[in-house]
Each structure stands twice: as C-alpha cells, then as structure tokens.
Amino acid sequence: MSDQPTRVAAASRRRSSGRVEDFDCRRLAVARRLACMSRAELARHIEVTPAAVTQYEHGLTRPTTTALARISFALGMPREFFCRGLNIPEVRSSTAHFRSLRTTPANRRAQALAFGELALAVLDLIERYVDLPPVRLPTLDLSAQPSQAEIGDAAGRARKALGVDSGPVPHVVRLLEAHGVLVVRLPADGFDPRVDAFSSSETASGRPLVLMSPLKDDKARSRFDASHELGHLLMHTGVEAGSRIVESQAMSFAAEFLMPRAEIEDNLPTRVDWETFHALKRHWGVSLRALVYRAHKLGRLSDPSYGRANRQLKQWGYPEPGPLGPPEQPSVLGAAAELVELRGAGLSTLAEAARIPLGTLHAVVAAGRSDRPRLTIGV
C-alpha cells in the first residue's frame, strides 16, 4: 500500500514525458479557426481523436512534441506560435454582432473572429510602446425594447457626445478610432466574402472591436456599416446577437446618426427626384438607397414612389451611380506600428516578442492601415 503513491507519480511522469511544457491552448484555438478547420478535421491531420484536440484547446492536456509538429504543419503556423507568448484575448461568438449571421457559415465567422482576436493582441502589444486613444464611448440608457423615437434620440445624443453637433459626420471610421475603438478591415484573400461587417463591445481586452468587409469598396456603404456597428456597440452590450430586431435597431441608429431627421427631413424630395437625391448623397456621404429608404421612412415618399425608386436602384445595381470615392479606411493600428518602428522596435522585433509569424503580423497591421498613397521626397 505504501508504494501506491510512488507508482502513481511515476505513471504520471511517464504520461507527461515528451509533452510540450510551454504549450498555449488559446493559440491552438486561434490558429485552428484562422485555418477554417474543425476539430475533427485537425484530428484527422494529426492522427488523434477529436476529443484529444478538444482537451488540447481547453488546457486539459498538452500535445506531445510529435503532435505539435503535426499541428504546426496542418495549420501553417510555426511551432513557436503555439508556445506561451503574447496573450490573445478572446471574443466570444455570442457577443459578436454579424450583419450576415444567417448567410455565413459558422466556421467562416469563427475565422473572422480569430483575426479580430489577433488584431486586439497586436494592438495590446503596440500599446506597450505608444499611447493609444482610450475608450471614450458614451453610455446610452435605453429601455429593453426601445421605440424608434428612443433610438433616434440615442443617435442624436451619441453625435453630441462624440463631438458631432450638426451636419454630416466627416469621417465615421476615424471618429470611432478617436474614441478608442479598434477598427480593422478583413483581408480580401483567404476570408469568405459573405462575412460582412461585425462588432463586439465585450472583448477580453476591454477595447471595442469593429471589423469591416473588404468587399464594400464604396465610401457611402462603408460609412453606413461603421455607423451600424457603432449602434451595436452603444445599444447592445449584453444583448444576444443575431436577431432581426437587434439588426433593425442598429440600422435605425445608423440612419439617424448619419442623416438626422431634424436636419434632413425638409430637404428630402416628395417624389423620385434623382438630381436632389444625388445632391444629398454628396452632402451627407450616404448612398442613394439609404436616402430613398430614409425618405420613405420619414413619410416624404409615398409607397408607390418608394417602389419606383427601388426598382430603378435594382436596375442600376452596385456600384450605384455617383460614387463618392474609396471606402473610409482605419489608420490607428498602422500609424501606431509606424511609431513603434520609428522608436527602434521594428515589426520583426515585435513578431519575435509576441511569437507571431512576421507575415501574420504584417497582415494584421495592414488591416488597420490606410492604403492611401504617401508622398515621399528623396534626394
């Protein structure tokens, strides 16, 4: 009997021998979702059971060095990525407001969320070197089932709190960034085009996240998307994501945020007048479709006129006439990375410290950088 504890300890040592001591289970979950791979698929690649992969990801057991080598190959990440390094905060899927929830496969949404988690981690790393805008979003007290009037009032209060008293919002994305929101645009390559913009205010890092679609190559649509996600951030913390009611509320918020009723109602035409709609489009930075919908919602366009306008818009398709230029781009993440480099810590140094592949780090930083051409003067 006295030898029993010794035998148990010896058996435990034998089982743990050859296992990776500094394995980070969170990083496995992130890498697997980035690769758009299920646990069962990964299990087949590395010749273990799906239950074993689940145990790895939940930190119940660690993979052997052989299993980790297979994981690294299957997911296209170096071994070092799966070892403890920079903490990658979690964004729970239940808190992420996807506009395309019903049309996007769950694994593709998980892939986009994993990219957002990496972006939050990179921003956290950069914040060790430079000061970033603190989170300064207003608190809006709304009832559990707010009316259209309540939502409109909330959008007006949000404009004032964010420093937009009247007129068009100059740059919605920069406004979000200035108030501490991390905004990034998903890479066009490797991600499902059906993944639309989404947001979450309930991140482990405490910084709100907005991911924009790379395919909305239009300024008007990107501005509305960003305003829609702002509505989620301000109105839907703790609210179950994905319902039609919640999405409709965010749409109403965005419409009032970009086109305040008190300022635009009298200027909206009472008939299908495309010249007037185009002038309003240029002034307010919104799409013709959004203006037509707003005119009908506010009672300026009758049902028959609204129907005629929508038939014409459908005939034109996308992009609609009168483009406003390229979409609004985020800039904080890219600009902060440049400041870090100016202070002597290049991206390669950051990548090594964070145990994130340099190529992956470049992709994340690029997602938060304006791609406007820069003037360089050489001698």
Predicted segments with their positions:
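Active-site hotspot residues in diverse enzymes, especially metal/ion-binding acidic/histidine motifs
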Residues: M1-V379
